[in-house]
Amino acid sequence: MAKAGKKYQDACKLVEAGKFYTAAEAMELVKKTATKKFDETIELHVRLGVDPKYADQQVRGAMVLPHGTGKSKRVLVFAKGEKVKEAEAAGADFVGSDEIVQKIQGGWLDFDVAVATPDMMGTVGRLGKVLGPRGLMPNPKLGTVTMDLTKAVSEIKAGKVEYRTDKAGNVHCPIGKASFDAEKLQQNFQALIDTLNRVKPAAAKGQYMRSITVSATMGPGIPVQL
């Protein structure tokens, strides 16, 4: 534990107290603070000037990062008939209908994202208490309830990420891995910031973006200029 603590302290020393870094500087620095033996995820944390208690101030959606997240996601598709072949051809890891529902009811959850055709949602709805709390329930707003399974699965495999405000109005989202080039991290960072600005709720008052921080999985937060 002491060794891990020292590595974290050394990483903290790289971050100048009170300084706000440019996006380019922050991406170079966050790579240096990723000192673990595994390929740490680089995360973006944005504090927004919204009150998520109100439905018209909630920020939620999905987007494809230009360079993906560096993580391969296991995709489950709820479908039947011809749509099964489409999902399989698109690269879905698991495809099925009632038998998959029964499997999940039995405790199986070895997937990262679930997609469903609209006609399957009546069946999938029975899994609400299992999938809902885990953020795995297909949602039309996120593009995971759709007839275009080719597009949905392809985008997820290409690095589609979901973003949403927590109870405090913060958005936490991965933008890549420590092994990524700083330039690719910056392009992913900018794409997500641009998206958050584009989906600003009309009801949000005052300053929208309050703070931006990036960090590696086990590293300190690095403040970024607004």
Curated annotation (Swiss-Prot):
One Pfam family per UniProt: Ribosomal_L1
| Domain of life of the organism encoding this protein | Bacteria
> Which biological processes are named by the entry's GO terms?
regulation of translation; translation
Question: Is the keyword Protein biosynthesis assigned to this protein?
Answer: no
* UniProt xrefs under InterPro entries: Ribosom_uL1_bac-type, Ribosomal_uL1, Ribosomal_uL1-like, Ribosomal_uL1/biogenesis, Ribosomal_uL1_3-a/b-sand, Ribosomal_uL1_CS
Query: Which keywords does this chain's UniProt record carry?
Result: Repressor, Ribonucleoprotein, Ribosomal protein, RNA-binding, rRNA-binding, Translation regulation, tRNA-binding
GO CC, any one term: large ribosomal subunit
Keyword set includes Ribonucleoprotein: yes
Q: Which GO terms describe its molecular function?
A: rRNA binding; structural constituent of ribosome; tRNA binding
- Family in the record: Belongs to the universal ribosomal protein uL1 family.
The role this protein plays is: Binds directly to 23S rRNA. The L1 stalk is quite mobile in the ribosome, and is involved in E site tRNA release.
Assembly and interaction partners: Part of the 50S ribosomal subunit.
> Which named protein is this?
Large ribosomal subunit protein uL1
Naturally occurring in which organism (per UniProt):
Selenomonas ruminantium
